[in-house]
Amino acid sequence: VGEKGAGETLLNGGSEQAGTNIEPVEEITAAGNGNLTIVLYFGNEEGYLTAEKRVIPKTPGVARAAMNELIKGPTAQSGLYATIPPGTRLMDIKIEDGLATVDFSEAIKSKHPGGSAGESLTIGSIVNTLTQFPTVQKVQILVEGRVVETLAGHLDISKPLERQAGIIRPNPGTF
């Protein structure tokens, strides 16, 4: 089975289903043994984001750890799709006055598969993963330390972004 990229998520097309919008999962909990449960957002087969809970070692830099886990991609058994292009590295992350400034390597742009829906999932996965933390209300995405207008030519990311709950759906493969 090949790896699934952000662009592949949307080839099947998505459909707007009334009543399927769920509240964002805001659950950062102690998992015991010095671990923490965080929520990561990945693409699903319908072209929306779906939450995947992941247990990580408790760390003071939990937002940094969450971004590194997001870059790793979803677990194989989740049936979800990676939203961050392969080869992308987290350069830096800072949180100040409710704003998370997250800086990625050039690969997030240069290796992005493109498409407005794929770009939306990439941005949404970053923003929604970071805004689960109570200290983060907005997210500014940088590439190699610079503010950029867009990742793949469709969506403006030159200004801080807020949580995007409208693109979160439960995993269609679960009941």
PLM region spans:
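Bimodal "functional hotspot" detector
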Residues: V1-F175
